[in-house]
């Protein structure tokens, strides 16, 4: 992938418009989880140190487009960001007509979704945004799969369009894992439904040496292999698709599972062989034998792509499979990349954040990239790199 990088450009005295992903949870006017804000700090600090006039933009939540609503205001984000940077970060409400900002200073533009035409990638809106800056920086990987005015359109019209460090690092890591991976390449795909991950599974089946499936997805593969799944979550209509994938790539089917009679935090867990699953059982995790087999694969791997837990790890009695796998990834010498909301929660829960080579900040964008889809924001940056 060839794109301009913000870190290679002279930013001194330039009007730099940076699209970050600052879509964080807010409760009672306070940010409750600031991981995305912290992830954007190196980009912002680099631009400030370089003496740029820094304008930040982001969306927050899903307001009615074109209408101001206080509950979706970025004011709490501006306050929190100011605390982290140790400086005032003014929030600019009406910013499309122009923004006053001095060299080495930063402002945050109010929620991009308050502008009519943002989601439709409106050309007139994109041109207004582009007129604000000398350099446009796309740094929000989490929204790179959406062609919107602040993530895509503005980049077509800005004098210069480049990738910020967060986006560039993300693309470098994904490229390393998918374009020319060290082998063996092992992918773990968990989650509740095959239907939502079918394209990912099909795309990976052509690239990986081992494909580990977990969660409800594994139940469909178990059923496809002729095993009983009781009243577990699985998709009967996708059994043929699962069988087709299993013919193309090695999928270690669980040999033992952890079951319960009900889906609840207090449900009693029972470990049993796959052939012993009863009609009223729900499979909620892989068993210890299966976890050992998967852990051994992690040891052999040179590249690991992880998306989705292998069990209902939110309930501790059904979290052992995901825990053992997470620790095996942490101990592995492989280049490992983890992405997707539930995956990041598991990485966090088992304390392996600094043991995973790269943690992807994008959920949908991560999956679409793994599927081999073209991300509109990335395509735009590649096109602008030729200017």
Swiss-Prot record:
SUPFAM superfamilies: Phosphoglycerate kinase. PROSITE patterns: PGLYCERATE_KINASE. It holds the Pfam family PGK. It is an enzyme of class 2 (transferase). Pathway: Carbohydrate degradation; glycolysis; pyruvate from D-glyceraldehyde 3-phosphate: step 2/5. Its EC number is 2.7.2.3. Keywords: ATP-binding, Cytoplasm, Glycolysis, Kinase, Nucleotide-binding, Transferase. GO terms for cellular component: cytosol. InterPro entries: Phosphoglycerate_kinase (IPR001576), Phosphoglycerate_kinase_CS (IPR015911), Phosphoglycerate_kinase_N (IPR015824), Phosphoglycerate_kinase_sf (IPR036043). Monomer. This is Phosphoglycerate kinase. It comes from Alcanivorax borkumensis (strain ATCC 700651 / DSM 11573 / NCIMB 13689 / SK2). The lineage of its organism: Bacteria, Pseudomonadati, Pseudomonadota, Gammaproteobacteria, Oceanospirillales. The gene is pgk.
């Amino acid at each position: 992938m060839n794109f301009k990088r913000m870190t290679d450009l002279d930013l001194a005295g330039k009007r730099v418009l940076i699209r970050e992903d600052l879509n964080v949870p807010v409760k009672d006017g306070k940010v409750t989880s600031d991981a995305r804000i912290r992830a954007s700090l190196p980009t912002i600090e680099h631009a400030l140190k370089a003496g740029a006039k820094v304008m930040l933009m982001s969306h927050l939540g899903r307001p009615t487009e074109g209408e101001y609503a206080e509950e979706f205001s970025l004011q709490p984000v501006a306050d929190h960001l100011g605390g982290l940077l140790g400086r005032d970060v003014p929030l600019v409400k009406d910013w499309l007509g122009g923004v006053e900002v001095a060299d080495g200073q930063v402002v945050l533009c109010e929620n991009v979704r308050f502008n009519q035409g943002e989601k439709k990638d409106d050309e007139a809106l994109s041109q207004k945004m582009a007129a604000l800056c000398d350099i446009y920086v796309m740094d929000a990987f989490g929204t790179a799969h959406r062609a919107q005015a602040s993530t895509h359109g503005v980049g077509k019209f800005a004098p210069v369009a480049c990738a910020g460090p967060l986006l560039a690092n993300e693309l470098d890591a994904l490229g390393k894992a998918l374009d020319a991976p060290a082998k063996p390449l092992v992918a773990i795909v968990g989650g509740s439904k095959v239907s939502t991950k079918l394209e990912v599974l099909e795309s990976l089946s052509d690239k990986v040496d081992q494909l580990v499936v977990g969660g409800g997805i594994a139940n469909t593969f178990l059923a496809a292999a002729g095993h009983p799944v009781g009243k577990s979550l699985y998709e009967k209509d996708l059994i043929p698709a699962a069988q087709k994938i299993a013919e193309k790539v090695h999928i270690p089917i669980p040999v033992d599972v952890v079951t319960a009679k009900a889906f609840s935090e207090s449900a009693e867990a029972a470990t049993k062989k796959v052939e012993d699953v009863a009609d009223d059982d729900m499979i909620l995790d892989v068993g210890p034998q299966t976890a050992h087999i998967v852990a051994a694969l992690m040891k052999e791997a040179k590249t690991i792509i992880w998306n989705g837990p292998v069990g209902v790890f939110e309930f501790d009695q059904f979290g052992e499979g995901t825990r053992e796998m997470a620790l095996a990834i942490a101990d592995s010498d492989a280049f490992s990349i983890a992405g997707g909301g539930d995956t990041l929660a598991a990485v966090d829960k088992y304390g392996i954040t600094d043991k995973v080579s790269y943690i992807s900040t994008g959920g949908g964008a991560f999956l679409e990239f793994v599927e081999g889809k073209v991300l509109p924001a990335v395509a735009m940056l590649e096109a602008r790199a030729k200017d």
